[in-house]
A protein has these predicted regions:
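Glycine- and acidic-residue-biased ligand/ion/polar-headgroup-sensing regions
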Residues: 53-68, 174-187, 191
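Asparagine-centered strand-capping/turn motif at beta-strand->loop junctions
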Residues: 88-93, 213-217
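Conserved hydrophobic/aromatic beta-strand scaffold that supports enzyme active sites
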Residues: 36-40, 58, 78-80, 100, ...
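Conserved short histidine dyad/triad with adjacent acidic residue
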Residues: 20-25, 35-53, 144-145, 157-172, ...
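A short, N-terminal "cap"/entry segment at the start of jelly-roll beta-barrel domains
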Residues: 1-33, 48, 75, 95-153, ...
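A short hydrophobic beta-strand segment most commonly corresponding to one strand
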Residues: 38, 80, 94-110, 158, ...
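Short acidic-glycine-tyrosine-enriched beta hairpin
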Residues: 58, 69-86, 192-209
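A contiguous, mid-protein "functional segment" used to position or interact
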Residues: 202-253
C-alpha cells in the first residue's frame, strides 16, 4: 500500500536551532531505499549535512536561502552530494526550509556509481527546459538525470498541474518513488481511491501500485518527484493515454534553456 506522510502531522525534532522532521525513514516505508527530512532553520542558523559511507544524496531549498560548502543556494537550486560528503548548511537572513534526501548503499542502484562526480554539484533547475504534456497544460522540469547528476541511482523532476488537469493512471516497475507537494492541493487516485494532498505532504509509491493525479482546485498543484533507482518501466492502465512530453523551447523564466530535451514518453527518458 502507498504511504502518505502528512507534513502538518510530522513531529519535528529540535537540534541546535534547527527543527528536523523525518518524513521518510525505513520504519515508515519498510525499506532503506531513501531517507527524507524536512529541515526548518531560523535566519542565521546552521545544520550539519553529512552522509554515511556508501551514501549519496541531495538538498533542495524550499524557502529562503543559504550556503553549503561555499556554494550559495536559493529556491532555484538543488545540490547533489557525493560519497562521503560532510558539511554545514548555513541559512541566510531569512527563515529557511530545505529537503534533505539520502540514498544509502547507492552502488546497488548504479553499477557505474564510481563515475559520479566526487565534488558538490548544484543545478539551477529554473534554467532547465520546460516540457508540456501532449494532452493538457501540465508542465515538467527535470531536476535529476544522469546528465545532470552523473548517476542513475535516482531520478527527479518537478511537475505542475494547472487547474483542471489530470494524469492518466499508471504504475512503475523497477523503482519506487515519492512525491513531495511543494505548492497547492491535489487529489491522488491510489488504486481507485481518492486521497487529498496538500503542500508539505509526501506520497510514497511502491512498484506495481496504480496511481494518478487530478487538480480540481483553482490554483496550481506542484510536486517534486524522485525515483530510486532512476531507470524504470512505466505501465499505463487499460484505456489510458500515454503521457508524452513536448519541448516548449523555454525555461521557467521564459528564456532559452541551457539544453534541449526532445519529445519523449514518460519512462522512455534514457540519456536525458
Amino acid at each position: 500500500m502507498p504511504v502518505i506522510v502528512r507534513g502538518d502531522e510530522a513531529k519535528p525534532i529540535s537540534r541546535i536551532g534547527a527543527e528536523i522532521s523525518h518524513l521518510l525513514t525505513a520504519d515508515v516505508i519498510g525499506n532503506d531505499r531513501i531517507g527524507l527530512d524536512h529541515v526548518t532553520l531560523p535566519a542565521g542558523s546552521s545544520c550539519d549535512v553529512a552522509l554515511a559511507p556508501g551514501m549519496i544524496g541531495w538538498l533542495q531549498v524550499l524557502e529562503g536561502s543559504g550556503v553549503l560548502a561555499g556554494t550559495g543556494l536559493t529556491t532555484k537550486h538543488i545540490v547533489y552530494l557525493p560519497f562521503g560528503f560532510s558539511g554545514s548548511f548555513a541559512a541566510g537572513d531569512a527563515d529557511t526550509r530545505i529537503l534533505f534526501a539520502r540514498v544509502p548503499d547507492a552502488a546497488r542502484f548504479d553499477e557505474a556509481i564510481a563515475d559520479m562526480p566526487g565534488e558538490l554539484v548544484h543545478v539551477d533547475w529554473t534554467r532547465e527546459p520546460v516540457l508540456q504534456s501532449e494532452h493538457d497544460a501540465r508542465k515538467r522540469v527535470y531536476l535529476a538525470t544522469p546528465g545532470l547528476v552523473g548517476t542513475s541511482a535516482f531520478k527527479g523532476e518537478m511537475i505542475s498541474y494547472p487547474p483542471g488537469t489530470a494524469a492518466p493512471e499508471h504504475h512503475h516497475v523497477g523503482a519506487e518513488h515519492f512525491q513531495y507537494v511543494v505548492a497547492g492541493e491535489g487529489t491522488a487516485m491510489l488504486d481507485g481511491t481518492a486521497h487529498r494532498l496538500r503542500a508539505g505532504d509526501v506520497l510514497y509509491n511502491y512498484q506495481h501500485e496504480p496511481h494518478a493525479f487530478i487538480n480540481e482546485t483553482d490554483a496550481d498543484f506542484v510536486f517534486v518527484e524522485f525515483f530510486v533507482p532512476g531507470p524504470c518501466e512505466t505501465v499505463w492502465s487499460p484505456g489510458a493515454n500515454l503521457c508524452a512530453w513536448l519541448p516548449t523551447g523555454v525555461d521557467s523564466d521564459g528564456n532559452e534553456p541551457v539544453r534541449d530535451i526532445g519529445y519523449h514518453v514518460h519512462g522512455q527518458d534514457g540519456g536525458i
